[in-house]
């Protein structure tokens, strides 16, 4: 099963929903403009990480603002 185009992280100029504000984004400790998206899971429940090249201009349909809770990790 592959991700649909709407769930793919994509470039959107001047987006109101940047990855930087999304609870599923984990910042890169060495480069603040990059990060990882952890919203996708595979069939066994494991996290499928995606690299984000630019957290200010990238977005997807699964964007959620807020903080990631402990329950979201398990």
UniProtKB/Swiss-Prot annotation:
Biological process according to GO: toluene catabolic process
Molecular function (Gene Ontology), one example: benzylsuccinate synthase activity
Activity's dependence on pH: Optimum pH is 8.0.
Induction: Induced by toluene, probably via the TdiR/TdiS two-component regulatory system.
UniProt keyword Acyltransferase, yes or no: no
Subunit field text: Heterohexamer composed of 2 alpha subunits, 2 beta subunits and 2 gamma subunits.
Protein's UniProt name: Benzylsuccinate synthase beta subunit
